[in-house]
């Protein structure tokens, strides 16, 4: 919040925050109390009626999930920014975000931050305010409030903000907290030479081929999303093949097939998408806006 005041050069700045996240999401629950403590308004909207809610409850800042960021990006890139009203800051959380999309939003005047955490870390974790092209897609750097490491590519955290375990569930606790107290998040990540962490996928989503090769569906989804005809996409294993599920207009299906063919030429053989399914309807998502696999 102090950063918003600094950016606007106004210590008395009043900001209305909108969240579309369900209240069982710790990010939304935390915002509810934090913004109230600051004396700022908290607007509770719905993903299904976002634009109506934004018009009815003007907001300057918002907690955003990928599907909403994509929609806002489309509005700005097609000259429909009037639909967004006073909105000028996005707190991106809950999943991976395309760096180019975030950079486009930044170039159109949006203040971008990325937050990473979970219920098991009491919402704390990493935060990124960097707005340069190299780091805008990062979830942040280690700020010293807890220990962070990568264990075979999996992001792990340990410290005072991290839970001791699940209530009356020692078996569940043992699956995610090791003997040294490290919480294994299930998120795959990499760290660059500047100490910035970048999510690369979810451990449970990794496709393990008969050859023993591992394929991150999120990596391929990021490539598919660069096709202008693709509205939404998901990559899965089907019949021992890597299959792309794409939501697009029927008239654009051949353009998508051509894009996949060209993309495959840039990939190792084991990562290539050899099947594609099309959907005219939006792909199913859960209450937090994440694709249901």
Language model: regions and residue ranges:
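Conserved AMP-binding/adenylation subdomain of ANL enzymes
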Residues: 2-86
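Thr-Gly-centered strand-to-loop micro-motif
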Residues: 19-20, 91-93, 150-151, 157-158, ...
């Amino acid at each position: 919040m102090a950063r918003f005041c600094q950016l606007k050069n106004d210590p008395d700045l009043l900001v209305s925050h909108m969240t579309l996240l369900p209240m069982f999401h710790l990010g939304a629950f935390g915002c509810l109390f934090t913004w109230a403590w600051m004396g700022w308004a908290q607007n509770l909207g719905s993903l299904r009626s976002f634009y109506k809610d934004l018009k009815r409850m003007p907001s300057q800042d918002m907690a955003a999930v990928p599907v909403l960021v994509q929609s806002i990006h489309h509005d700005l890139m097609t000259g429909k920014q009037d639909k967004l009203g006073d909105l000028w800051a996005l707190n991106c959380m809950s999943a991976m975000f395309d760096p180019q999309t975030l950079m486009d939003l930044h170039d159109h005047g949006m203040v971008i931050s990325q937050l990473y955490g979970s219920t098991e870390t009491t919402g704390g974790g990493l935060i990124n305010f960097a707005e340069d092209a190299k780091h805008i897609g990062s979830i942040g750097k280690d700020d010293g409030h807890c220990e962070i490491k990568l264990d075979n590519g999996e992001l792990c955290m340990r410290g005072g903000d991290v839970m001791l375990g699940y209530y009356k569930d020692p078996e569940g606790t043992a699956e995610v907290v090791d003997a040294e107290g490290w919480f294994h998040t299930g998120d795959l990540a990499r760290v660059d030479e500047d100490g910035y962490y970048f999510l690369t996928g979810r451990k449970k989503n990794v496709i393990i081929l008969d050859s023993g090769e591992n394929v991150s569906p999120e990596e391929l989804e990021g490539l598919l999303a660069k096709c202008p005809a693709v509205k939404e996409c998901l990559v899965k294993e089907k019949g021992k093949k890597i299959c792309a599920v794409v939501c697009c207009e029927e008239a654009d299906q051949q353009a998508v097939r051509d894009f996949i063919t060209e993309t495959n030429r840039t990939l190792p053989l084991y990562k290539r998408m050899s099947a594609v399914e099309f959907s005219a309807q939006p792909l199913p998502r859960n209450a937090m806006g994440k694709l249901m696999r």
